[in-house]
Amino acid sequence: MPHTLLILNGKEAGNQDVRNAVKNLRDEGVTLHVRVTWEQGDAKRYVNEAAALAVETIIAGGGDGTINEVASALIALPESNRPSLGILPLGTANDFATSCSIPLQIDHALQLAVKGRAVAIDLAQVNDKHYFINMATGGFGTRITTETPEKLKAVLGGASYFIHGLMRMDTIKADSCEIRGPGFEWSGDALVIGIGNGRQAGGGQPLCPDALINDGLLQLRLLIAEELLPALLTSVFSGEKNKNVIETTLPWLEITAPHDITFNLDGEPLSGKNFRIEVIPNAIQCRLPPNCELLG
């Protein structure tokens, strides 16, 4: 049987459920190697070492940030020597895994990550060297997800992002920017910017509810109004039509701003004044369940 590598976020090294699930697969005859991350860059190094182990699948065991780091390293490998991606959701929000209908039960998720059908999915590339598999968020949404305290995440899980956002409404400030892409141009002040390959962010909020991960397109949604924010956020996260929510789909877009703005790429912040974001169609293979709603 082909070899599999599990890259496990260091925070989960002592997780007994993970250890049990790994043992069960090994008892079935699966050759499953495990590497634990300690610091930034470990996941990339483990991915690069995977070729020497004749690995067919690399499993990202952690949250959205871990998945991002593994996927970003995979796309850098030659296509002929690129393992498939498996996902073991162990984070706070697990936005990408949840929207893909990957089970949150550790044993079920690990079985899927090893034995599931591999399908081609898109990645999004930012400024030629950064990537996201799920979503890039800007504006108020970025500040919520990057500033939510770890203790609040531990207690409340995905809901912590929304609650922390309510607590921080006094800090709301729009980002002035220009956005253009094929057949689309807009300039103004945006409270929330969502650029989705996947659909949800911030602990289960469907910011880009129509996005697909294999259509060669990104869904862009902008919240531009200055009216009462709670009502607007309800519209954004529920998918309701609202004149202050602008949306489109496009294969690439460019964003320019007179000042630094910060985007959250699957949980990882990236700041600058100029961004080019484009889809890489069929970038990697990912093991997903048959009922994954993000496949067109």
From Swiss-Prot:
The keyword Transferase applies. SMART domains: DAGKc. GO terms for molecular function: ATP binding; lipid kinase activity; magnesium ion binding. Its EC number is 2.7.1.-. One of its GO terms (cellular component) is cytoplasm. Keywords: ATP-binding, Cytoplasm, Kinase, Lipid biosynthesis, Lipid metabolism, Magnesium, Metal-binding, Nucleotide-binding, Phospholipid biosynthesis, Phospholipid metabolism, Transferase. InterPro entries: ATP-NAD_kinase_N, Diacylglycerol/lipid_kinase, Diacylglycerol_kinase_cat_dom, Lip_kinase_YegS, Lipid_Phosphate_FormReg, NAD/diacylglycerol_kinase_sf, YegS/DAGK_C. One of its GO terms (biological process) is phospholipid biosynthetic process. Residues 1-130 form the DAGKc domain. Its cofactor is Mg(2+); Ca(2+). Mg(2+) binds at residues 212, 215, 217. ATP binds at residues 37, 63-69, 92. Gene3D superfamilies: 2.60.200.40, Probable inorganic polyphosphate/atp-NAD kinase, domain 1. It is found in: Cytoplasm. It holds the Pfam family DAGK_cat. Binds 1 Mg(2+) ion per subunit. Ca(2+) may be able to substitute. The active site is at 268 (proton acceptor). HAMAP family: YegS. Probably phosphorylates lipids; the in vivo substrate is unknown. Belongs to the diacylglycerol/lipid kinase family. YegS lipid kinase subfamily. NCBIfam families: lip_kinase_YegS, PRK13054.1, YegS/Rv2252/BmrU family lipid kinase. This is Probable lipid kinase YegS-like. It comes from Yersinia enterocolitica serotype O:8 / biotype 1B (strain NCTC 13174 / 8081).
